[in-house]
């Protein structure tokens, strides 16, 4: 579970991620949002976000509720909006690279609907998000000479597979990789 934040703009942050992240991060985003919406944080309901088969994400045990990124997402409505926008960015990028709709599309649509219904705000409030949490190796986490965005870029760059994982659209590979 993580949010690989490489840019303050949630869509731009999604656009530069490797193929592997574009495939798996929408699911992690939906799982995180389900926990944030559940009794563990906002208490909007435990069965609001449907998986592709229509069943809700299981939030009863609150898996990952203590993860730094989940805590960050729940710290403010703006942070939650940022995560939803990032999720949509990931879904758009998935469709661009793979030519099909990700199985998390329905859950993300519902996440936006519930967010707007419960808060009375649109996702544009994501611009008010607080500084991002970093969940990664200590070598990046405790490097006080870099910010969180740079830490995530270096974390991604440290993966031996990352630089060659833009097979679907090599033009998306960022210059920092």
Over which residues does each language-model region extend?
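Sequence termini and other peripheral, non-core segments
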Residues: 1-66, 70-177
């Amino acid at each position: 579970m993580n949010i690989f934040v490489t840019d303050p703009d949630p869509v731009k942050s999604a656009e530069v991620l490797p193929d592997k992240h574009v495939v798996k991060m929408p699911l992690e985003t939906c799982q995180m949002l389900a926990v944030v919406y559940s009794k563990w944080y906002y208490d909007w309901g435990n069965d609001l976000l449907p998986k592709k088969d229509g069943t809700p994400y299981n939030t009863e045990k609150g898996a990952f509720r203590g993860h730094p990124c989940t805590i960050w997402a729940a710290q403010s409505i703006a942070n939650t909006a940022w995560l939803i926008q990032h999720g949509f960015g990931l879904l758009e990028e998935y469709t661009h690279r793979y030519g099909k709709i990700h199985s998390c599309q329905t859950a993300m649509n519902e996440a936006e609907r519930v967010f707007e219904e419960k808060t009375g705000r649109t996702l544009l409030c994501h611009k008010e998000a607080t500084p991002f949490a970093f969940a990664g190796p200590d070598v990046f986490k405790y490097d006080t000479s870099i910010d969180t965005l740079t830490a995530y870029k270096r974390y991604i760059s440290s993966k031996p597979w990352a630089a060659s994982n833009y097979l679907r659209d090599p033009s998306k590979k960022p210059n920092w990789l």
